[in-house]
Every structure is written in C-alpha cells, then in structure tokens.
Amino acid sequence: MYLGFEQVALVGQVFESFVLEHHKNEIAQILTEKEEHAHYSLVVNAMTLFEANMEIGEYFNAFPNEVLPVFDNALRCAAMSFLQSCSEKYTFLMKQNLHARITGLPVCPELTREHIPRTRDVGHFLSVTGTVIRTSLVKVLEYEQDFMCNKCKHVVTVKADFEQHYTFKPPIACSNEEGCNSTKFTCLSDSSSPASCRDYQEIKIQEQVQRLSVGSIPRSMIVVLEDDLVDSCKSGDDITVYGVVMQRWKPLYIDMRCDLEIVLKANYISVNNEQPCGVVINEEVRKEYEDFWVKYRNNPLEGRNEILASLCPQVFGMFVVKLAVAMVLAGGVQRIDSAGTRVRGESHLLLVGDPGTGKSQFLKYAAKITPRSVLTAGIGSTSAGLTVTAVKDSGEWNLEAGALVLADGGLCCIDEFNSIKEHDRTSIHEAMEQQTISVAKAGLVCKLNTRTTILAATNPKGQYDPDESISVNVALASPLLSRFDLVLVLLDTKNEDWDRIISSFILESKGCPRKSDKLWSMEKMKTYFCLIKNLQPKMSQDANVILVRYYQLQRQSSCRNAARTTIRLLESLIRLAEAHARIMYRDVVTTEDAITVVSIMESSMQGGALLGGVNALHTSFPENPREQYRLQCELLLDKLGLQKLLEEELQRLERQQSEDSLESDLGESATNLVGHKVVHSECVMEETFSTFEASSLPDETHLGVTGSAAFIQTPKKTISDMTKSDDTIRKGTITPAEQNRGISTDAESSLKQGNAQPLAGGHLSENNLTKCTDNSLGWFDTLQSIQMSPITKQREGCTAEKLQQEVLPVSTESSCHPADKKVVNLGGRNKLEVLQASGSSPGGNGRDLSNHTVTCGSSPERNKRDLSNHIVTEHVSKKWRRINKDSLCGKNVPSFQPQSENTDSAPVCSSVPLHSTPDVAQRRKRIIAQVEKQSKAEVEDPDTKARLAQLAKFSFKRHSKLVHSPAGDTDTASNAQKHDHPVQKITLSEKLNNLGRTVNNVDKSSNSVNGSKQQKHVENTSKQTVITQKSNFESNTLNAPVHETKLNEGCDSRKVSSSTLAKLARFSFSPPPENQAAETSKETLILPRAVAPGSKRKCFELNPSTDKTTMSSKSLFSTTDLDDEELDVDWEAEIKGNQRIAT
C-alpha cells in the first residue's frame, strides 16, 4: 500500500506551513551558509509535529519510507518561500540538499526501544539506544544511474536498491509513452565519474550492558548513515538512533541460501555522552543537596560519612575502602599544563584482598551508580578485548572498540585483575596514564580516547606476606602498580570479634531486612556523583604545603618504593584531594581534604612513610568524625612539622564545635519553650517566655526567682566529664582564681561549658525544693557533689500559685534585701556570684549549713512580695569561705562517704514521683508537718535538754596517724567560733538535725574497727551507689520520671533518739585502715557505662563510646580494638539485666 497523490500533497502542505511557523530562524541560518552543495539538516520534534496535525502522525507511522522524502521536498519548498518573502535576498543563498531530521518520539513501546529490533519491526520508524562498538570507513555511494534506450533514445533514471546493498537493476523495457518496447539500454553514467553520489558509512551498535538482565548477552545490529550523518559518532559513544528498520540481502544465486539481515537506516543520531543516562539534574535537585550540606555545615565530616554509609550498604564497615571508592568515583580535575600536555583527572584504584572480603561487591555497585561503565573479568579479557581489535568485514578491515574504549568518560571495572596474561596487561599502560590507545593494525593507524577510571580487584599470590613488597605478593609489575593512585590491602586475619559482628550483620539482613531511612537510595547516589563532576575545585595554599611536604617525606623515606615515589605520587595526591573536595561539595581544596588524603595514602600500600600500612578491611565508621579528624591532624601535621597549620586547624575545629553546640542548645531550648506553651496556662506561658529570654544565652548560668517560679539552669554533663571533675576535686587541683571566687571545680566547669539546659522545663525540681527547706545552701552543694544530673519533666497541672507556695519555704528565712544582690564578672561573662559554705559536722562534710544561716527579720508576706523580681543570694563570712576552700582542697577534712551524703540529703518523701498530683503534694506537706511536731516535742523534753548540754562539751581527740579524722572539723569549728562573726540564730530543730547527722556518721565510723565487715559494707555500699547512678542515668536518658533510691530507709536524719545521745558520751573513735580508705575512695569513682538509647544496633559499635575516638599509636582510623561487651548482641539478656537493676 502506498500513499496517493492527495495524501502526498496534504502531507507536503502541512509540513511546509509547520516549518515556516516553528523553524523560521533555522531556515534563515541555513540559507546564510556559503556552501551551496553541502547537506544541511533541520531537526523537527515529532511530538510538536503530531500535535499540530494528528493525520500527519498516522501517515508517518504507517509509511515512513514514503513520508520522509515528502518532508525533504516540503522543506525545500519552505526555504524557497522564505527566500522569496525576504526583502534582503542578496544575503541568502538557496540550498538544494536539505533534510528533515525527526527526533523526540513519544516514549512508548511502539516507538522507543532499548533493545535491538526484531523482524516484526521491519518498516517502522523507531528510536534505538545503544553503544557504538565499530565504525567503518566513509565510502562514496552512487544512489542513482541514468539508462538510455538504444531504440528511441529515452532516458530512464534508476535508483539503487537499498534492500540489495545498493545495487542497480537495469529496466526491463522502455517506459516511453510513444510505445517503444525496446529492452536494450546503455548506462550513461561512467564508473570513473558518477553523476549522483553521497557519503555512506556503516556503524555497529550494541545494547547497553547496564540495561540488560544478568546473564543476557548483548546483541548488535548495523546502522546505515548517509549524507551529513556520516562521522557523527565514534567507537564507544552512547547514541540514540532514529530511523526506519529495514531488511537487506545480497544478490541471489542458485543453490545458495539467502543471507538476510536487519539494519536500521538512520534519519537522525543523538550522542548521549555528555548527558547522563536516566539522571535529571535541575534546580530542585541542586537545592536538595545544598540543603543537606547546610544542615552539616558545622560538622561536614558527619555528612560525608552519611554518604559513605550509603555506598555499597550491603557490606559492613570497611570505612577506608568506601572512602577510597567514593573519591575514585568523584574523580579529579583534568587540566592541560604549560607544555600542552593533558594531565589526567581520573584516579585508579586497586583492591588487593583475600577471597570473600567484598571486592567484587564494590565493583558491581560502582558500575551501577556510574552512568557509563563497563564490568569485565580478567580471566576472559585479552589485549584486544580491553583496547581495540581489527576485524575484517565485507573485504575490508574495521576497528572494534574494547572495554577501555567503550568506557571512555566513565568507569571500567576489572575483576580478577591478576588473571590477565602478562603481555596483555602491558597493553593497558598507555590507557591508564596517557588515556589514549594508539593502534597500528591491518594498515589502520589511529588513536582512540580511553578517558576512564579503572577500578580493579585482585587476589594475592598465595598467602599474603607482609614482609614482601606488594609487587611480589600480587605478581604485578611495578610500572603497572605505579599507575594506580591507591592500592588497598584487605587481609582476612583471624579476629573472633570481627567474625561475630559480620555473621550477625549477614543473618539480620537475611532474616528481617529493613532499609534505613538515613541511607541514600541508589538513584540519589547516582545523581549526586553526576552532579559533583561539574565542580572544578582549586587548590589552596595550605593544601599545597601539606601535600608537597608529604611528597618530600615519601621521597626521603628509607623504605620507599622507587617506582612509586615519583612525580606520579604528587599528581595522585592532588587528584584525590580534588576528589574529596568534590565529595564535600566544595570548589576549594582545604586543609581538611589534604589531611584526609594523606590519611588514606598512609593506609594504602603506596604510602606508609609516616606510620606504615593499615589493614583496611577491619576499619570501622568513627563514632565522632570530628574527634578522629582532630587526632589525624595532631598526628600527621606533627610528623610533617607543620605546627602553625595544626594550631589554625584546631582553632577552626573549636569554632565549629562551639557553633554546633550553640545551635543544638538553641534547638533544645526552643523545644522546651514549645512544651511549656502546651502545658502551662497563658499567664505562666508569659513568665516562662520572659525567663527563657533571660536564660537562653549559653554562657550564663542563672539562679533566681522570677515572678512566682524558680529557675535553675543546670549544665548537661557526660559520664566522662563528671568522672574528670570528681577526680579534680579529690586531687585538690583547683586554680587560685577559682579559690578566690569560692566556686567549686564542677560549678566553674559548668559555667564555662555553656551548653546549659533549663532543669525540669525551667522550674526547680521537687527534690531540690525539699533540700532547700532547711535554709541552707543545699542547692549549691548538689551542684558540687552531683554525679548524674537528671532532667525532670514539668508536672502536669502545675500553676503559678502552686509553684509560688513550693518556692516560699526557700525564701522565707534567706537574705532577700536588694542590697544583698551582687553580680560579678567570671571569665569575661556576667555570672551570679555563688558563695558556698562548709559546715563543721563530720558526717555532713560541709553539706549542712543550717547552724550558720543568716535569717531575715521580715515576715513571710513581705518575702513573698519582694521575691517577685529579685535574685536570691546567701552571704556568709570570709572564714566560712576559707573553710570551704580547705574542704575542696582536702586539707584536714574528714573523708566523705557516698552513703552518708545520700542519707543526709534524702528527704522524708523523696520517693514520691516528680509528676505527682496535687493530692500527693498535700499529703507530703502533712507528713513533713507531723515530723516537725514530733521533733519539737522531743526538744521540749527536759531529759533531752540535759543530754544536749552534755553533748555541747563533747569533743573528739585528734589521732596523729589518721588521714580522715573528725578532729579537723572540731578545730575548724573552734576556729570559726573565735572568728569575729555576727551571732547567728540557731534553733533546736536545726541542732537536732546536725546532731543526727553526726551520730549517723559516728555509728558508721565505729563499725570500721572490724576490717572484714567494713570491707564488705563498703563494697555493698559502692555497688548500691553504682546501681543508683546507673538507674538514675537510664531514667534520665529515657526522659522518664526520676525516682531517688533510699540507701538507708530505716535511718531518719531528722530524729535522734535519747538512747543514741546517751551513747555519745562514752563513744571512742577508732580509725579505719589507710589502705581501706584508699580502696573505698577508689571504688566510689567507678561509674557505670552508659548505653545510649536509640535503634542503632549495638554490634555495629566497633569502638568504645568515649568522648574521644580511641586509636592506637600508629593508626589513623578506627581499627579492630574491639570490646566484647559492646559486640554482644544478646539483647534479651541485656533487657533482663536492665530490669533487675531498675527494680
């Protein structure tokens, strides 16, 4: 079936009007060209054309071979019409060889194919995507001839038959209308001077490997190019061909089988090398990645590790390998030096490891996320298969591209690299360094580009011997090894911890695989690596200094590899530094990039001049990337002798850390503020917001009563920080400046940290309120002696009036005159002057100051009015300040036992939850009132008064050999009485409280005579203390209500029986052994290891979770110093253990 005359006229008219409307500028540009006989193309989008007229689309899909010549004629008519309508005709020149090129077909299975077409597609116009594997020479094709009838001299034009390889078949009979029936013709065109010729070329395309399923062999087909399409592509290009599927065969012979083949007659070719396949990069995508790096601007290494964790996530750990693969995929910047020589920007990586170490997994993943990649194995690769081969086809020699040529501009992955034969491996030397392949085969001399990154994997030759060189272990020549920028060694050494963690990782992924939300998808990774290749980072001066100094050190090393430590090493360092800057999404190579590259190079077998090689298999992701980088800076820059750069880099890290902590504090404060708005009423919301504004600065610690609510901002502290502060207090290492200010070491460090958080949503907790009701500085003592600072939740239904009633006992007897307020400057910031006093009772160790509290003569009503907008401070004499300093420094101060502190400070109802209801609070008040009545009743007893009078004359005798003696406190008390101090009011209830504490501690000290019993008692007490601290910390971590554990429930410090007072007169103090006291103090320092909450698998934590990343003296990364406790994955046993501790 063919198109009729009317259909041809319709198609011509519609296409001519369409071209004049949409492509008028292109026609004008073609007509301005000088060459008249050249071929010119006009690219037309098929979607736009079909939308203009659907009937054209139907004709085009049904009869493409007939419609395309009509399009060319209509284009010439449109050019003629434009030329006639143009006023300046002298600037244009009419062209005859115009061709309409159709592109942009609708994406549907009928028109778009990713695989080679089959027989059913013959006669259809399709778009086929593939890779050019062979290009033939350009030929001259005679497409038509003229034949003249010998009888009537009629001339007949015959076109070459495409289906029979462009052969000419003379006419059978004369077609003259006058009725000439002659069958003899003479060809007018001579073979030496053909009349009608055009350029002709055949190429061979192959299906793209990444679009095939596993095990499928890629098929290929011939594509015919004519006219201006000739030489539009080369071997290795990814192209999309738009054309008509046709079949052709050679001339038929008797008793010969017809050789039929399917070819694609191209109408247009689009080269896709510059455009990544399946990757769309627009402003929205760029904004997404920019927001990601803005989030990690203060800790960019953590953002980089998140990207590395998404690289080949099925392989556990191997941090160094993943970082090296990511840098190789990112690549460096290609440049041309002053001599005109092109310096490659692509890096090469060789993975050397034992079988089963995950080398092939990295190769497969890298090939997937790279748009243009080739994956091959060395066992089946030859020199011709890797580079280029010469093939004879149809009597002529053609060149077929190999793996390296096909991967031009992409990635070539070669597995089992050592399986390639020796003479075949030498053929890729030029491809790796000069990135070209020079060919002189079968009379063909040419040079092909191989601008590719090579990622190879190999096994060592037998057992890897660390004493031998890498060339001997791998059986590769030094010239080939020196062309690899990195050579990482993965040794499967015997490590039970590593085997346990790998097995648990694999079994979990097999049993219940789940995808982490934090990991990037493969499409996102593919888009990101395509995006960062557009960055062109420049080297900074600091990075140049580090790389040059390291290169010089490598050259001076006694154990250097002469084949490696050439100028290629310096170029490799530059390329890898630029690649790391690309990964970090920067356009400048900084000191951070240079330090990271030197660390990777030291882990590679190409380095090792500073610290020696590292087994990259057992390296893990660091818990704190900033701390690990800090250690790398201190180690490497110190070895390189760059102290100035080290100081600058450490200062930069400090700034980043402070900014990061500031932002986190502001975020937490904002979260607390939102929580207050939900819970409190409107009036309380206003007070909370005003107080938050006053206390939100990170450098200030506020203590005051604002409005009707008390706010204390307690700094957050880790276990390690608290351990250090306790050690500092016990050793007495307090600076003179801190002694002059009278502030404890813990409090000062808390003030300097700046990352404070409002306690219990900004309000004073109930425990602290209860401790402060004895008119002492107990709230400040808790800041000094606290081990774990639980942050409690705000109670529900808490109103301003109730808070005012609870705070009122704190302020009724304290100094509240405005003149008593005093603010001093501490460390360059305005701080509230906190004065700490120490009492003389041996049991309290300065914890109770009720005997020396300055009372205020004002009434409670007045205090209630004055406390609305004032800050409450308590002042004591200078003598008491000096006593406190002596107690902190350990001068003549009795030892402090943890159990005594808990006994003294534990209130009557300390076990009541902090989120108790108003009924419980009222019941607690009634219990306190009853206790006070009972204490007053005992004081009024005359026998009790007599015993108190006797007790006033009681004193301990000082023992010369004792370290922890109560005599020091007695002397301190006597000295305090001699000092000129105003007379203070002391109530009987306060005396009883102090005497009760004294009796309790004396009873405990008397038990120390029996050595074995005391030792058991100390061990049990220390265990209880550790359990209490751990349970408090876990409850604080999980944001649960905090319950204080009573260690001595039967002992009440507020009540002292008469029999106990009578025994005091006959009491004789016997000291505990000195070594026992030392063991006790040492045991009290033991803190539980905190288990951070979250969904993170515990078996993944390869390193102890400390404040700094633990590293060996010669290790730049976290290696296999594993802890059995952290690698334990028996979660059921751990949960049961936590439940037992909690109960």
UniProtKB/Swiss-Prot annotation:
EC identifiers of the protein: 3.6.4.12
Catalytic reaction list: ATP + H2O = ADP + phosphate + H(+)
Q: Where in the cell is it found?
A: Nucleus
- Source taxon at top rank: Eukaryota
Biased region (Low complexity) positions are 999-1012
For this UniProt record, the keywords arranged alphabetically read as follows: ATP-binding, DNA damage, DNA repair, DNA replication, DNA-binding, Helicase, Hydrolase, Nucleotide-binding, Nucleus
Q: Which parts of the sequence are annotated with region: Disordered?
A: 721-767, 838-864, 895-915, 998-1022
The record ties this protein, via Pfam families, to: MCM, MCM_lid, MCM_OB
User: What biological-process GO terms show up in the record?
Assistant: DNA damage response; DNA replication; double-strand break repair via homologous recombination; regulation of DNA-templated DNA replication initiation
Q: Which InterPro entries match?
A: AAA+_ATPase (IPR003593), MCM (IPR031327), MCM_dom (IPR001208), MCM_lid (IPR041562), MCM_OB (IPR033762), NA-bd_OB-fold (IPR012340), P-loop_NTPase (IPR027417)
Asked whether the keyword Nucleotide-binding is assigned, the reply is: yes
Query: Can the keyword Nucleus be found in this entry's annotation?
Result: yes
Q: Which GO terms describe its molecular function?
A: ATP binding; ATP hydrolysis activity; single-stranded DNA binding; single-stranded DNA helicase activity
Q: Per UniProt, where does ATP bind?
A: G353, D354, P355, G356, T357, G358, K359, S360
Query: What is the recorded function of this protein according to its Swiss-Prot or TrEMBL entry?
Result: Component of the MCM8-MCM9 complex, a complex involved in homologous recombination repair following DNA interstrand cross-links and plays a key role during gametogenesis. The MCM8-MCM9 complex probably acts as a hexameric helicase required to process aberrant forks into homologous recombination substrates and to orchestrate homologous recombination with resection, fork stabilization and fork restart. In eggs, required for MCM2-7 loading onto chromatin during DNA replication. Probably not required for DNA replication in other cells.
- Which family does the record claim for this protein? Belongs to the MCM family.
PANTHER family referenced in this protein's UniProt entry, alphabetically:
DNA HELICASE MCM9, DNA REPLICATION LICENSING FACTOR MCM FAMILY MEMBER
Q: How does it assemble?
A: Component of the MCM8-MCM9 complex, which forms a hexamer composed of mcm8 and mcm9. Interacts with cdt1.
Q: What is this protein called?
A: DNA helicase MCM9
UniProt source species: Xenopus laevis
